[in-house]
Amino acid sequence: MKKTTLKFAALTLLGLSNLALADAASELQMRLAKVDVLSAEFVQTVTSGSGKNVQQGSGKLQIKRPNLFRMETKTPQETQIISDGKTLWFYDPFVQQVTAQWVKNAVNNTPFVLLTSNDKSHWHQYTVTQQSDTFVLKPTLSTSNIKQFDIRVDANGILRNFSTTEKDGQTNLYVLRNITNQTLSDSLFQFKPEKGVEVDDQRKK
């Protein structure tokens, strides 16, 4: 009888835990869905696993629901991450190289796309817990290079900051400022490699 009671209690706690995770994921998706369009400047801080600030950067973030995402880092080195909803492009103008991946295959290592995604298959790749306005996402697959992805978004759906923590402990924090909700053209989220740019098309693999 005692073993049965303990087993029942354990199953109850597990059920409550799964319910809490589901509620946190639903709450996060609901908050993100409140803002269809967002443009902002960001300040990036890279911190090593030992807690030392190793790099500062800045750039611009533009998102449009559903599924459109553009993040341009201006300093210390220009890079672009662009999603048209199907393909995720990683462009490095300095070396004239771009990598193309299917979004569905990139979510595991590039959780940024979740900021605009309604796709359940994307969200199922992460567990979500909530601490006030901060949501902590952890990948369900051990193959991910990401340890966790933190999103701070208020009850009105305003994205304040987000960060990635890699398995080695390095953290990339992006703090947003000068946030606007002006209309954005879909063309901002299209990428066409210029002549001379080397393309690593991983969609064919």
Swiss-Prot record:
Protein name (Swiss-Prot/TrEMBL): Outer-membrane lipoprotein carrier protein
Protein transport as UniProt keyword: yes
Quaternary state and interactors: Monomer.
Family assignment from sequence similarity: Belongs to the LolA family.
Record's subcellular location: Periplasm
Superkingdom as given in the UniProt entry: Bacteria
Pfam family, one: LolA
Function, in words: Participates in the translocation of lipoproteins from the inner membrane to the outer membrane. Only forms a complex with a lipoprotein if the residue after the N-terminal Cys is not an aspartate (The Asp acts as a targeting signal to indicate that the lipoprotein should stay in the inner membrane).
Signal peptide: 1-22
High-level lineage: Bacteria, Pseudomonadati, Pseudomonadota, Gammaproteobacteria, Pasteurellales
Species for this entry: Haemophilus influenzae (strain ATCC 51907 / DSM 11121 / KW20 / Rd)
GO terms of biological process kind: lipoprotein localization to outer membrane; lipoprotein transport
